């Protein structure tokens, strides 16, 4: 037998191990390595948005008032996109445009690129946070995969689309009414509602809402009587080992309603994940197509017949005319720097005019 004499030397922790221990410590709010990206970026994005909507005008970029200081409210205030003349400049505060002048930087629209970039990295940090936590507690990473869908939409709308156009000017500004303006722009200039990728996105979001409502109602309807409490929540025991609701009863119910029903909880919940995530991914792909000015469905035969026959009109041809009206009215209002002037006879006229 061999006896080893001497004291065991404990390995010294390096800086990485020390940081890893602190960042991944079990605490009320988990930080993690992803938190190094998430928390600063989220702080700066929200701080920039609150600063912009409170104090900063859009007069120099859009000819608009956009702050509480100018009289806007929560629905009409916005952090607006930079001027079209600045194209795709990242508009750093220290860059050649603002040259370190914070007031000038705000006037040029620098807060928009600041909020957009920090917002995007904040969202990515939140997705990485879900990956990190899932790995720590040995869960599958489907939460993070699902969250990639809204990230894809954000990146495609706020970055890919304006990169395909002439500048950040054509991205959405960060505000409620500003987003509505952007939606109208998408419809008028891209016929977005007739785009098959938009249709898939709508089917995904509304389908997910329907699935959530059906699933929640079905679970509530088939709860086991596991207590004598006054309501569902008082009767529920968080440490129970048995099922909360009867999948068999739910399956029999929907089999009678539709003729088919989910017989497996895994497939049911995967479908509830698949529908909205795929819809949002498809919508993001469609916006990438719009960045390249790819067109939606064109039913040219109907347009030709409507042009030749005054008595022939479809909902499609009516929508095409409405899009032309949006473009004619909106271009001059939306792009004042172009000094667009349309002859009176080409502008659409409604009953109010």
From Swiss-Prot:
Disulphide bonds in the chain: none
Keyword Zinc: no
Gene Ontology annotations of biological process type: photosynthetic electron transport in photosystem II
Segments crossing the lipid bilayer: 41-61, 125-141, 153-166, 208-228, 279-295
Note on cofactor: The D1/D2 heterodimer binds P680, chlorophylls that are the primary electron donor of PSII, and subsequent electron acceptors. It shares a non-heme iron and each subunit binds pheophytin, quinone, additional chlorophylls, carotenoids and lipids. There is also a Cl(-1) ion associated with D1 and D2, which is required for oxygen evolution. The PSII complex binds additional chlorophylls, carotenoids and specific lipids.
Main location, first listed in the record: plastid
Residues bearing PTM Phosphothreonine: 2
Subunit structure: PSII is composed of 1 copy each of membrane proteins PsbA, PsbB, PsbC, PsbD, PsbE, PsbF, PsbH, PsbI, PsbJ, PsbK, PsbL, PsbM, PsbT, PsbX, PsbY, PsbZ, Psb30/Ycf12, at least 3 peripheral proteins of the oxygen-evolving complex and a large number of cofactors. It forms dimeric complexes.
Name of the protein this chain belongs to: Photosystem II D2 protein
Natural source organism: Cuscuta exaltata (Tall dodder)
